[in-house]
Amino acid sequence: KLPWRVWKNTTISNKKYFELISNFMEEFNPEMLEIYNNLVQNKRIELSIDKYEGERYVRGLCFCVGNLKETYVLSRFNNKMNTGIILPHELGHAYLFYKSDFNNESNIFIEAYSIFIEFIFGDYLKNTVYAGSAFNNEYQRLDTFLGMVDYEFDNLIKLKGMNFDFPFYYTKDGSIGNVDTATLILSNMLGMYLTHLYRFDRDRYNNEIKVFLEMYGRTTDEEILKYFGLKNLTEGTEKTVRTYVKTYRR
C-alpha cells in the first residue's frame, strides 16, 4: 500500500476530468469513446456527490432502459481523483449493455468488464500526475477482493459444482448461497484475468475479450465460466496481484 505521504488525492475540474476520460477512451477503445461521447452530448452522465436514495453506499450507477436501448450513468465524483475511477467503471457497464444489445438480465459476470476497465484506466493514470491515486485505487480494489475471498472462503470452495438460478446459486450438495458472493468473486477474477492478458499478452487478450463480448447476454453463466476456466481465472488473479507489488516496488 502507498504510504500516505506519497499518495496525493489530486483535485481536478470537471472539464479536465472529462478530457482525461476522453483521452483514455481514444487510446483504449474508440468504440467505447463513441458511446461515451454520445452519453455526454445527450446529457446522460451526471456527476454529483449526493447519495442515492435507497443506495447509500453506492458510488456509481448505470441504468439500462432495454426497450429504448439507452443507458444513463451516475457517478459520485467529487473532483478528487480517489473518486475518478467511478465513471470509467460505470462506462464499462454502458459498453457491456451496448455490446449485448441492451440485455438487462442478471448475469454473474456483470462486474467483470467494469473491473477490468478500472485496472486499465489506472495503468493510464500511472503515466500522469495522478499516478499516486492510480496506485491507491488499485490497492483498494485488490485489498477488498482478497478480504472478501478470505471472508467467503467456505462459499468459494463450493463454486466448483455450482448451478445458477438468480438470485441464488445451488451447489452439488444442495446447499444454497447468495449469488452476490459468486458475482463479486468471479467478476473480480475474470476482470483481473483480462487485465493480466491486456498487459502482457495482447494477442490472447484480443481473442478472449472478443469471446467474452460474444457470449455475454447470449449464453449461460455456466458456459462462460466453463470457457474461461477457474484455473485461468485464478492464475490471472494471482499474477495481477503480484504485478501490483512489483510495479510499486520499482
Predicted regions: what they are:
Residues L68-L87, D101-E105:
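Short pre-active-site segment immediately N-terminal to the catalytic Zn-binding motif
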Residues L20-E31, E90, A94, I120, ...:
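Generic, well-ordered alpha-helical scaffold segments in large soluble proteins
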Residues M81-I86, N104-A112, G177-I185:
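Short, conserved micro-motifs enriched in small and acidic residues
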Residues I86-E90, A94, Y98, A112:
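Catalytic glutamate of the conserved HExxH
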Residues S100, N104-V149, S187, F228:
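Post-HExxH zinc-binding segment in Zn-dependent metallohydrolases
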Residues S133-T171:
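Amphipathic alpha-helical blocks and their helix-capping loop/short-beta junctions
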Residues K1-Y72:
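Contiguous, non-catalytic segments that form substrate-binding/exosite surfaces or channel walls
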Residues F121, G161-R250:
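C-terminal, non-catalytic "cap/extension" segments appended to globular domains
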